[in-house]
């Protein structure tokens, strides 16, 4: 009796279950609508996992299809049973024995066990050798090794001789166990087992039960026999049955197509032609020598293919294929050299043409004639017509299409990749008439045998679609698997073919095509969607082929149709029966033989009465879970738990039968679900109900603990039940475009004015404060930089100086440097006297002088500014001071002010006339300290010059330097018509008064502290020494300005001093505010305390020979300073430091010397040895033991030695000259001379030197360097004269706070970047720890969602804005003429409004306002300081610029004045219009004599020149800057765009992200200054909770008064500080106190025998503890750190995900902190690169493998097992650490392989999770974690610091910024992602990987390899 499925169906009886006719309605069958979530059975687990379960449970024979799965099962089983084999052989431990058939398999197994476990493995493969061993020798082996891998012969020998008894074996593994059926040692070994009472567990492995055709009876017998011999149950892997045995089985149909009737006779005729030709060729006896090609081969192949097409598809197709083959043949004929071969090819060609001609007689090839196709084809078309969609479906299914889910893919490997970015290409023309790709309800595959059949059948179906509207919906394509095989090398042409195939697959996956015609290649291994129609056009010939093609029909309603010719049908039915029988046998062997399909037949019955549903809000029909839907809910919930691409978490259900015949089920959820206990259901009548009921109970529990939401769906990470964590803030309403928190969004803020300077203009008869601005030259300009050989003018040489008069006191701020032409000048602001009053007249005089300084000396007044001292927000007076009558007391210099008022030269040019009668008389003393004005030119803005030198040897009659004039007198007569009255007067060499008013940074260094190139130093020297380049003036023609040069030089510093003062006061104010908000530091500083000086932290390095400057003793005596002293460095010292690294920067020690107090003995001896040795490429001083040393060196580092700006210095001898902090005036508090020695740890333990005069060494700052560890201890113990103040107790140095407020765009000597990075990693750490401890039940997905919300730029920006940071930030370069508002001035609204929109002075500030030039990289806002061409001197040395550039800038500088700038926020750059620089109409400059006038040009606008070349400025579309001009109406930016217009003097425009950066930098600043607890409190005060709040009772408040000392809480974030040790004080309003974080209480679950299980699971881990040198107090942490989510045998702890979340942040912080504290002081860029090079998965995974983490890893995931296996092998071969730049590919010969070796993320994860585990286990001690991890990471940190690696993608983009373009992702045939990078002109490079990111870096790495290989040929531009 035939089974109904096999009835041959006639045409009429073909009943297909198509989606359209399905009872569930037309859409149910959309293949992509169905999620891969099973609703009526639990999601099946991977078959290998179930086989492992079986093997753990009982003796098992594993029948697998492939070899790879065998190893996995064997190794994991060994590991699971490993606790039985650790330790000495009997009595306690046993041994595991692996038996293999041949010697060469031994090594393979050995490496597998060694790779994945730490067990000791012995290998025995040589019978001769092993047979001769004695019993003793064997027992040694057994003692040493726990796993024995031997060939069966050796094993038999060992067992027979009793060297090892079977009872000592815990597990016996037989590889290739099917051999036991034959007469084989395996059989004898099993015989021995029979006699043994305690037989070991047996595992048999076989892959060859099924080979080719075999008879079901035989098969069954074979299996039974094997089971009997091995005393085991055979279990097959599902891959032999049907790939997913729970998928509903497809409906199988065999169709009898009926005979082919050849009415026209064409078929017969063609067949005859072909057969004759084939016979003819076969008969030609062409002698074939073995070496030659067979001449007939190609012809035979072509003809037989053609014949096959004719037979299978009919004449129409044969015609098509003949046409294709003719084209193909032409190529062969053209290239064929040999005559004979050629003849055969031509013969074939002729025949094919003949066939085509015959066909043309019968039908027109253009259209399809169904008379000429076989019945099989007709049948196929008929089946396809049934799948035609209904009309209405065409609309509704669009929705499904859009919601389709990636779960529809068979392969899981794509679960993490997005392919949204793939462009959908234009379809080929024939498809255009299809309604749309959405209507494809069909998703089908037709399997054919031959390639040509596939190609032609596809053509035929396309033709049929054109003619038959019923078939028009089909969009088909074919895939032949040509060259798709994985490993063979591929030619270019094959490569193209391969690409085409992948495109076909991509379209099929995307449902753009709905029918695929394929050869058997698609049967296995290719990732394609679930199909609802599979047609076997050619019948399957063996079981495997049958099962695998059937396995493709996996949609819920699917048909598997086999088309058979009438003559074949009988024999096929026999085959089919066999296949079915085999399938059945194998099914029974399936480890879970519940047959999904049959069990569900009665699913439709309403079971609600059996067990009531779980309903929410029953009254209003709320959501419910019924007994029928519960399993689906549980599956869906498990699928949403966090996991990696390798693991798909599924529930595990065990059903047991009770004695009374009822069943109960126990349900276990994956181990990372918060519901950890197993759930036991009530007993039910049948298995199915038992399983369902337990699921229903589970849903109820999940809902109760908040894991299912109110719709009973899994709670996503977004709908966090921890609402309070995401303080949901209302997003501010702004009209500003851009995403909040991003760089694209900029807003304007007013610039902050410090409270103490706000409206503090002195009033008559009210008490005032007078401050002195002390100026001391601490580092004179070295000769190398003094190109003009100018004399240096130390400001302290003259007594007259400036002071500040104010109505409010100014807090103490650190001294700070300004850089004048003479060198570095240290500025101090000291209180001179207070409480005095001034009269109205005095104040008026002072006010007039104040205005005179800013308007006339500094020329800062412009139309837009108005002097209104009473109305100005920031108002105080600047006035001259001098010593009073020979005493040394300074006071206000009223006489001087009055003299100035009277002077004629005060404003204009005095009109003195000399004549022959009253000739000019030269008085030398008048000119010694004078500023002079030429009286004959530039009357509106006369030039002012310092007299540099009086040339007594020159007179007006001396020779004029240029040939046009004879003498100076003649020049003036000719050019200006001036006659001189005194021809004997000397001439004056003059210098311009400085126009550079930004003196914040030295001009020979850029803002990174790096010397600007001095290439032209020699040229310059020559230039300045020749007279031609000097300005020579005649005294008679000049007027003397009433302000002496010495005071003028000080006045030039005023803008910089006041600006810096202003910024530091803002920072000090912020420090005080934080002290009251967060309780960190004190509100007001003690009167006797001053912070160490502001320091840029770089040594001023210059590229030149070492120079020696001597101590100028006369100065030293007068002024109490020894002025310039440096270490004298021998010329060759630099070369001795042989191992110099480019990063090295502090190669010589700097020494400061300060005059000792009077009681100490006279002169200070400086004896510093010059013997510098190089240690690690850094030179240090060997013998610094002299007592004077400490004093000498201590002032140099200034506490926050945060040397931010180290840059790579060219490797040339470099010298440092000292920074000296010299204090002025006796009445100031004694400064603390503290210093953190950079090189502390190298100073031979000599750190504790004391100062020579016995004054105790004072230290006020913690050592920030790691090198300063020793110092740190000393600091804690010492008592300093300033009562032990330190920034730990007082708060950070305002200088450091200022640094945290300064963006890199400000081009200052420091910026926030380094601090920001430190703050960033600490913030991540603090929040992570807080979340980890506060939410012990939240899984990693939720924790990381909460973290990302908290640390997002958007959130930080909000908090920073709330705290008022934007106003305090320093965002643009200080340029006094453009954006500085002098004290007492206001922006004149009337004048500036008129000009708000059109300004011609939009110089650089527009570009520098903040953010990058045009192009915002996401990482950092960096702006390279592009100085003009000769960078070294942009101040006032004549630079060679084009005439028109100079005119342009001059005209800009003479422009209208108010600097308002406009930024267009349009996304498009209007580059053409934005850069028309318009000249003002009054271009009165004409052509000017180069030698003089050009010198006057104001280089303070040097930056305008940087932007002369528009191409450099705005590259992309961030914002466009318009340069506006009053005289031109509509130039510049299109007025349509939205723009921000703001006033540069009082407002600043800042990107949101910069504010977020600033918050992080401030955090870094508090962290380095006040420690970790303080940083946490600072975060809490911002509103970021990182500590638990505790409420204190009033009694406690009394116990812990507000101002408690802070140091008690300095324990690193440890949970050990008592919860009551709360913050010292919070702001009065909020009574919040913060406690300390508590370690989450339990890490083990309540479990009856938890301890036992724990010891069981971590057996062997003691070896690992030894390896990392840390012993766990609580071993559960250790187990948790190694438990992967797939490892369900661990029922007592969670998996590692939470610890990984914690460890990731801890390692990031520790590594960042270490890099930050590196004595090499890496620059921000290097720091970022190093951090990303060290904190990444590749490095962590490599280290994990190096330290054997993988051997202890606990996971049950076959794919992961293989990836780890590959990676470990790869690491062993490479045997070196992998950096980002490392070659992650297998070896040289894999050049063709596009894929990098895959780095298993799980390895990096356990590296992190172990850090988290140690942190928790050690009571939250970061130190302990670092002690364990630093030794592992140290070699890498050293290696990378010396040579910073960059990610390949970045390196490529830096190398080829214009030409490298990455393609979007393409999906490869096996589900991976491919990315192509094209480097224009140099080739295309491809990379493949599991995700877009991995593929992208693989591609970049390939491109780099190729570019580097070809570099020599590329000329270096």
UniProtKB/Swiss-Prot annotation:
Residues 409-433 are annotated as: Disordered. This is Endoribonuclease Dicer. Double-stranded RNA (dsRNA) endoribonuclease playing a central role in short dsRNA-mediated post-transcriptional gene silencing. Cleaves naturally occurring long dsRNAs and short hairpin pre-microRNAs (miRNA) into fragments of twenty-one to twenty-three nucleotides with 3' overhang of two nucleotides, producing respectively short interfering RNAs (siRNA) and mature microRNAs. SiRNAs and miRNAs serve as guide to direct the RNA-induced silencing complex (RISC) to complementary RNAs to degrade them or prevent their translation. Signal peptide: none annotated. Residues 1844-1909 form the DRBM domain. A motif (DECH box) lies at residues 175-178. The record marks 1801 as: Important for activity. Residues 256-595 are annotated as: Required for interaction with PRKRA and TARBP2. Mg(2+) 1 binds at residues 1316, 1395, 1398. InterPro entries: Dicer_dimer_sf, Dicer_dimerisation_dom, DICER_DSRM, Dicer_PBD, Dicer_platform, dsRBD_dom, Helicase/UvrB_N, Helicase_ATP-bd. GO terms for biological process: apoptotic DNA fragmentation; global gene silencing by mRNA cleavage; negative regulation of tumor necrosis factor production; negative regulation of tumor necrosis factor-mediated signaling pathway; pre-miRNA processing; RISC complex assembly; siRNA processing. It is found in: Cytoplasm. Component of the RISC loading complex (RLC), or micro-RNA (miRNA) loading complex (miRLC), which is composed of DICER1, AGO2 and TARBP2; DICER1 and TARBP2 are required to process precursor miRNAs (pre-miRNAs) to mature miRNAs and then load them onto AGO2. Note that the trimeric RLC/miRLC is also referred to as RISC. Interacts with DHX9, AGO1, PIWIL1 and PRKRA. Interacts with AGO2, TARBP2, EIF6, MOV10 and RPL7A (60S ribosome subunit); they form a large RNA-induced silencing complex (RISC). Interacts with BCDIN3D. Keywords: ATP-binding, Cytoplasm, Endonuclease, Helicase, Hydrolase, Magnesium, Manganese, Metal-binding, Nuclease, Nucleotide-binding, Phosphoprotein, Repeat, RNA-binding, RNA-mediated gene silencing. Residues 895-1042 form the PAZ domain. The modification Phosphoserine is found at residues 413, 415, 1016, 1160, 1456, 1464, 1466, 1863. Residues 630-722 form the Dicer dsRNA-binding fold domain. ATP binds at residues 64-71. Residues 1276-1403, 1661-1819 form the RNase III domain.
């Amino acid at each position: 009796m035939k089974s109904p499925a096999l009835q041959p169906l006639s045409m009429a009886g073909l009943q297909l279950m198509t989606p359209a006719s399905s009872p569930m309605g037309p859409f149910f069958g959309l293949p992509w609508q169905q999620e891969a979530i099973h609703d009526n059975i639990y999601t099946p687990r991977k078959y290998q996992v179930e086989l492992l379960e079986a093997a753990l449970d009982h003796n098992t024979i594993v029948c697998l299809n492939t070899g790879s799965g065998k190893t996995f099962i064997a190794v994991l089983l060994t590991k699971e049973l490993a606790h039985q084999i650790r330790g000495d052989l009997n009595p306690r431990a046993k041994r595991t024995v692996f038996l293999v058939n041949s010697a060469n398999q031994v090594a393979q197994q050995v490496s597998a066990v060694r790779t994945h476990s730490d067990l000791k493995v012995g290998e025995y493969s040589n019978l001769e050798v092993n047979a001769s061993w004695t019993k003793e020798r064997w027992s040694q082996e057994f003692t040493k090794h726990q796993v024995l891998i031997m060939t069966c012969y050796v094993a038999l020998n060992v067992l027979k001789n009793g060297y090892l008894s079977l009872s000592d074996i815990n597990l016996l593994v037989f590889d290739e166990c099917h051999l036991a059926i034959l007469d084989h040692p395996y059989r004898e070994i099993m015989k021995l087992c029979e006699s043994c009472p305690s037989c070991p567990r047996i595992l048999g492995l076989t892959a060859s039960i099924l080979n080719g055709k075999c008879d079901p009876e035989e098969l069954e017998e074979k299996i039974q026999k094997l089971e009997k011999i091995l005393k085991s149950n055979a279990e097959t892997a599902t891959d032999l049955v049907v790939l997913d045995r729970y998928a509903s089985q497809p409906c199988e149909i065999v169709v009898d197509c009926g005979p082919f009737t050849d009415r026209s006779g064409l078929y017969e005729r063609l067949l005859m032609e072909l057969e004759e030709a084939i016979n003819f060729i076969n008969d030609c006896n062409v002698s074939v020598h073995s070496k030659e090609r067979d001449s007939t081969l190609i012809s035979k192949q072509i003809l037989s293919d053609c014949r096959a097409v004719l037979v299978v598809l009919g004449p129409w197709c044969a015609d098509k294929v003949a046409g294709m083959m003719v084209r193909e043949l032409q190529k062969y004929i053209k290239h064929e050299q040999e005559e004979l071969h050629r003849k055969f090819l031509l013969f074939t060609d002729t025949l094919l043409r003949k066939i085509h001609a015959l066909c043309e007689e019968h039908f027109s090839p253009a259209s399809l004639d169904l008379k000429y196709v076989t019945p099989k084809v007709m049948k196929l078309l008929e089946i396809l017509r049934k799948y035609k969609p209904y009309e209405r479906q065409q609309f509704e299914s669009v929705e499904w299409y859009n919601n389709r889910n990636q779960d529809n893919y068979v392969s899981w490997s794509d679960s993490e990749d997005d392919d949204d970015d793939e462009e959908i290409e234009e379809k080929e023309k024939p498809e255009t008439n299809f309604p749309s790709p959405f209507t494809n309800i069909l998703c089908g595959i037709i399997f054919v045998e031959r390639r040509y059949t596939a190609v032609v059948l596809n053509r035929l179906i396309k033709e049929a679609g054109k003619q038959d509207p019923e078939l028009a919906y089909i969009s088909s394509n074919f895939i032949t698997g040509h060259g798709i095989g994985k490993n063979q090398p591929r030619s270019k042409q094959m490569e193209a073919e391969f690409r085409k195939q992948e495109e076909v697959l991509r379209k099929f996956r995307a449902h753009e095509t709905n029918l695929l015609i394929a050869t058997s290649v698609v049967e296995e291994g290719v990732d394609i969607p679930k199909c609802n129609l599979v047609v076997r056009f050619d019948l399957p010939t063996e079981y495997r082929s049958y099962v695998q093609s059937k396995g493709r029909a996996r949609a819920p309603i699917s048909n598997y149709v086999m088309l058979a010719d009438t003559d074949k049908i009988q024999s096929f039915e026999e085959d089919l029966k066999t296949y079915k029988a085999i399938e059945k046998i194998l099914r029974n062997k399936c480890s879970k033989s519940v047959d999904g399909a049959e069990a569900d037949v009665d699913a439709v019955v309403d079971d609600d009465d059996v067990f009531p549903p779980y309903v929410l809000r029953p009254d209003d029909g709320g959501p419910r879970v019924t007994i029928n839907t519960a399993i689906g809910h549980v599956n869906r919930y498990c699928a949403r738990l966090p996991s990696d691409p390798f693991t798909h978490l599924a529930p595990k259900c065990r059903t047991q039968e009770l004695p009374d015949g009822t069943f109960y089920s126990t349900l276990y959820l994956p181990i990372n679900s918060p519901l950890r206990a197993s759930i036991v259901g009530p007993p039910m009548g049948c298995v199915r109900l038992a399983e369902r009921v337990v699921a229903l109970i589970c849903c109820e529990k999940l809902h109760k603990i908040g894991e299912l939401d109110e719709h009973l769906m899994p709670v996503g990470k977004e709908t966090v039940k921890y609402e309070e964590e995401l303080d949901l803030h209302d997003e501010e309403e702004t009209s500003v475009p851009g995403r909040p928190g991003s760089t694209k969004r900029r807003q304007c803020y007013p610039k902050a004015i410090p409270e103490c300077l706000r409206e503090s203009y002195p009033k008559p008869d009210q008490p005032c404060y007078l401050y002195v601005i002390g100026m001391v030259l601490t580092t004179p300009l070295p000769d190398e930089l003094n190109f003009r050989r100018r004399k240096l003018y130390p400001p302290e040489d003259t007594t007259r100086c400036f002071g500040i008069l104010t109505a409010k006191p100014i807090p103490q701020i650190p001294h700070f440097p300004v850089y004048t032409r003479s060198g570095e000048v240290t500025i101090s602001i000291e209180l001179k006297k207070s409480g005095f009053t001034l009269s109205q007249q005095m104040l008026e005089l002072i006010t007039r002088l104040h205005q005179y300084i800013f308007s006339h000396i500094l020329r800062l007044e412009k139309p837009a500014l108005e002097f209104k001292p009473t109305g100005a927000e920031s108002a105080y007076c600047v006035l001259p001071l001098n010593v009073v009558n020979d005493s040394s007391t300074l006071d206000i210099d009223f006489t001087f002010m009055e003299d100035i008022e009277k002077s004629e030269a005060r404003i204009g040019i005095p009109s003195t006339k000399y004549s022959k009668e009253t000739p000019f008389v030269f008085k030398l003393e008048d000119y010694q300290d004078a500023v002079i004005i030429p009286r004959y030119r530039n009357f509106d803005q006369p030039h002012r010059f310092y007299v540099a030198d009086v040339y007594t040897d020159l007179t007006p009659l001396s020779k004029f330097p240029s040939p046009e004039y004879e003498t100076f007198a003649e020049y003036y007569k000719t050019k200006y018509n001036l006659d001189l009255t005194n021809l004997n007067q000397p001439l004056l060499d003059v210098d311009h008064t400085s126009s550079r008013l930004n003196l914040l940074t030295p001009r020979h260094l850029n803002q990174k502290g790096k010397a600007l190139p001095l290439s032209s130093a020699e040229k310059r020297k020559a230039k300045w020494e020749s007279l031609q380049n000097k300005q020579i003036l005649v005294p008679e023609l000049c007027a003397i300005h009433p302000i002496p040069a010495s005071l003028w030089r000080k006045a030039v510093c005023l803008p910089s001093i006041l600006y810096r003062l202003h910024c530091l006061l803002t920072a000090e104010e912020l420090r005080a505010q934080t002290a009251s908000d967060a309780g960190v530091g004190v509100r007001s500083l003690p009167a006797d305390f001053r912070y160490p000086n502001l320091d840029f932290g770089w040594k001023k390095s210059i590229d030149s020979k070492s120079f020696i400057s001597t101590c100028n003793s006369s100065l030293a005596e007068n002024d109490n300073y020894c002025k310039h002293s440096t270490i004298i460095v021998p010329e060759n010292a630099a070369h001795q430091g042989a191992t110099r690294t480019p990063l090295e920067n502090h190669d010589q020690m700097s020494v400061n010397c300060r005059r000792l107090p009077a009681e100490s003995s006279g002169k200070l001896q400086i004896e510093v040895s010059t013997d510098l040795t190089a240690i690690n490429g850094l030179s240090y001083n060997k013998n610094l033991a002299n007592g004077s040393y400490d004093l000498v060196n201590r002032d140099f580092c200034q506490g926050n030695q945060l040397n931010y700006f180290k840059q790579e210095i060219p490797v040339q001898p470099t010298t440092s000259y000292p920074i000296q902090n010299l204090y002025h005036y006796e009445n100031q508090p004694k400064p603390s001379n503290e210093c953190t020695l950079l090189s502390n740890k190298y100073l031979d333990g000599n750190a504790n030197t004391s100062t020579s005069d016995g004054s105790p060494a004072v230290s006020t700052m913690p050592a920030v360097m790691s090198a300063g560890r020793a110092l740190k201890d000393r600091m804690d113990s010492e008592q300093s004269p300033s009562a032990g103040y330190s920034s730990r107790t007082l708060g950070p140095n305002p200088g450091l706070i200022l640094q945290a407020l300064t963006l890199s765009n400000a081009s200052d000597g420091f910026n926030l970047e380094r601090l920001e990075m430190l703050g960033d990693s600490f913030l991540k750490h603090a929040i992570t720890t807080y979340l980890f401890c506060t939410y012990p039940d939240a899984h990693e997905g939720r924790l990381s969602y909460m973290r990302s919300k908290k640390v997002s730029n958007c959130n930080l920006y909000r908090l920073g804005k709330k705290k008022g940071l934007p106003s305090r930030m320093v965002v643009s370069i200080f340029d006094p003429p453009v954006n500085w508002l002098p004290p007492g001035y206001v922006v004149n609204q009337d004048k500036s409004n008129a000009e708000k929109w059109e300004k011609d002075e939009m110089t650089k500030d527009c570009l520098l306002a903040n953010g990058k030039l045009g192009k915002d990289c996401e990482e950092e806002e960096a702006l390279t300081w592009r100085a003009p061409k000769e960078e070294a001197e942009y101040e006032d040395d004549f630079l060679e610029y084009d005439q028109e550039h100079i005119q342009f800038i001059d005209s800009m500088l003479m422009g209208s004045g108010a600097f308002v700038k406009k930024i267009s926020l349009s996304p498009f750059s209007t580059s053409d219009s934005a850069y028309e620089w318009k000249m003002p109409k009054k271009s009165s400059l004409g052509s000017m004599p180069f030698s003089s006038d050009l010198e006057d040009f104001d280089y303070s606008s040097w930056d305008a020149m940087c932007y002369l070349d528009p191409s450099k400025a705005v590259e992309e579309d961030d914002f466009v800057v318009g340069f506006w001009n009053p005289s031109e109406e509509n130039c510049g930016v299109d007025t349509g765009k939205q723009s921000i217009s703001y006033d540069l003097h009082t407002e600043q425009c800042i990107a949101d992200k910069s504010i977020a950066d600033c918050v992080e930098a401030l955090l870094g600043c508090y962290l380095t200054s006040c420690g970790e607890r303080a940083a946490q409190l600072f975060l809490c005060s911002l509103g970021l909770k990182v500590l638990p709040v505790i409420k204190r009772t009033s009694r406690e408040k009394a116990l812990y008064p507000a101002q408690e000392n802070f140091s008690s809480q300095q324990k690193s974030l440890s949970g050990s500080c008592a919860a009551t040790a709360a913050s010292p004080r919070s702001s009065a309003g909020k009574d919040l106190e913060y406690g300390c974080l508590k370690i989450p209480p339990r890490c083990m679950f309540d479990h009856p025998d938890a301890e036992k299980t724990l010891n069981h699971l971590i057996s062997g881990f003691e070896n690992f503890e030894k390896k990392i040198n840390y012993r766990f107090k609580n071993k559960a942490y250790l187990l948790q750190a190694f438990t992967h989510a797939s490892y369900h045998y661990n029922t007592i702890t969670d998996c590692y995900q939470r610890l990984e979340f914690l460890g990731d942040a801890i390692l990031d912080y520790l590594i960042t902190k270490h890099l930050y504290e590196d004595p090499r002081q890496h620059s921000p860029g290097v720091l970022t690169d190093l951090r990303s090079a060290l904190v990444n998965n590749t490095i962590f995974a490599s280290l994990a493998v190096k330290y054997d983490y993988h051997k202890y890893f606990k996971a049950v995931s076959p794919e992961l097992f293989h990836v780890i296996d590959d990676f470990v092998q790869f690491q062993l071969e490479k045997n070196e650490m992998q950096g980002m730049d490392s070659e992650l590919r297998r070896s040289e010969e894999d050049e063709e392989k596009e894929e990098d070796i895959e780095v298993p993320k799980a390895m990096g994860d356990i590296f992190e999770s172990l850090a988290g585990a140690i942190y928790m286990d050690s009571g939250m001690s970061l130190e302990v974690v670092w002690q364990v991890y630093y030794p592992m990471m140290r070699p890498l940190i050293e290696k990378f610091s010396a040579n910073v690696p960059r990610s390949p993608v970045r390196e490529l983009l830096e190398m080829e910024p214009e030409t490298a373009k990455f393609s979007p992702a393409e999906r490869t045939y096996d589900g991976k992602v491919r990315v192509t990078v094209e480097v224009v002109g140099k080739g295309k490079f491809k990379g493949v990987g599991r995700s877009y990111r991995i593929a992208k870096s693989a591609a970049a790495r390939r491109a780099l390899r190729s570019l580097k290989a070809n570099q020599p040929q590329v000329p270096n531009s």
